[in-house]
A protein has these predicted regions:
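N-terminal pre-domain/capping segments
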Residues: 1-105, 124-125, 135, 173, ...
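Alpha-helix N-cap/helix-start motif
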Residues: 18, 119, 157-161
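Active-site-proximal loop/turn and secondary-structure-junction residues that shape catalytic pockets
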Residues: 12-14, 37-39, 75-78, 112-117, ...
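Acidic/histidine-rich catalytic cores of soluble enzymes
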Residues: 3-8, 33, 125, 132-186
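Active-site groove signature of glycoside hydrolases
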Residues: 100-121, 144-153
Length: 186
């Protein structure tokens, strides 16, 4: 039987250096984490701040703490219907594929855009934008051997189990996964 490994969201431990963050997570008894650099690492304000040096420091902290990176939390707005905004968000996600690979992360993870951020856009339009985004991201992930997971949230573009199934069936990529936090359905 497979071993059950318990992890924690890094950003629940506050914004710190990667060394302090992973040490604190390990000291709390966890063996893996969702590391969202822009939410958890004090020196990171944008994905441009995730440098090769920071990735190397993260890998060193992983080795020292014994806390692995289960999810490289790459929070971007994948469902913007505005094409310029959507492409900007896709570029952010694509910039992090080599990071996830270097971290040996279990997967990259993102939510799918709060519908309140684009009140004149229908959920169907937002889901179509999500499909376009994933259609651009997944081929790169497949090429690099990186898994990409989307998280269903009630008030986001991908908001129900049926919407999740539609996305999985439409994209049909072996590298597409789903993060399931049941609290997000209420």
């Amino acid at each position: 039987m497979s071993e059950f490994i318990v992890g924690a969201r890094g950003h629940d431990f506050g914004r710190r250096s990667v060394e302090e963050l992973l040490s604190s997570i390990g000291d709390a008894g966890f063996r893996c984490t969702q590391l969202a650099y822009t939410k958890a690492v004090e020196s990171v304000k944008s994905y441009a701040d995730v440098t090769p040096e920071l990735v190397a420091a993260t890998n060193a902290a992983v080795q020292k703490s014994g806390v692995s990176i289960a999810v490289d939390g790459t929070y971007v707005e994948l469902s913007y219907a505005d094409e310029d905004k959507r492409r900007t968000e896709v570029a952010k996600a694509l910039s992090q594929v080599p990071v996830a690979k270097a971290l040996r992360a279990g997967c990259m993870g993102s939510e799918t855009t709060n519908m309140a951020k684009q009140p004149t856009v229908s959920r169907r339009e937002a889901q179509e934008a999500l499909l376009r985004s994933l259609g651009e991201i997944l081929p790169v992930c497949e090429e690099q051997g990186v898994l990409f997971a989307v998280e269903c949230v009630y008030y986001h573009a991908m908001n129900t189990p049926e919407a999740v199934k539609m996305v999985l069936d439409t994209i049909a990529s072996p590298n597409l996964r789903v993060i399931c936090d049941l609290a997000n359905y209420v």
